[in-house]
Amino acid sequence: MTTTTKPKAAYWIIAVIAFIWNVMGVMAYLAQAYMTDEAKQLLPEAERTLYDNVPAWATAAFALAVFGGLLGALSLLLRKKIANLLFTVSLVGIIVQMSYNFFISNSIEVYGPGGMIMPIMILVLGIFLFMYSKSATTKGWLN
């Protein structure tokens, strides 16, 4: 039997925010993965070309990032140690996806420097949630 300690209020706030954030990520993934041709036609041509040329491995990385993050956040809410593994999977997905966006595709040309703000924020939050879940495990908050 393992011993756990009770987490502070900040833990629950972070876990709820992480859950909401990752629900939004799943919604963004589903919107992109299942975007209809009619919806794509409403995009500027450069954006439409970006969407049409995303390789399957980058889409898979996006899916791993958001679904791993959602399950990790749910695990935080349930105080389960698997949260750290799930946030690790999510972070790997984020890194792979962002590597494609920054270094392989021409998304920076299409969206401009301002288009880097959200991806950088996603990466920072992914690192934070990975480190936070590891810390929560060390502190005995997760079982």
Where are the model-predicted features located?
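Topology signature of small-to-medium multi-pass alpha-helical membrane proteins
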Residues: 1-143
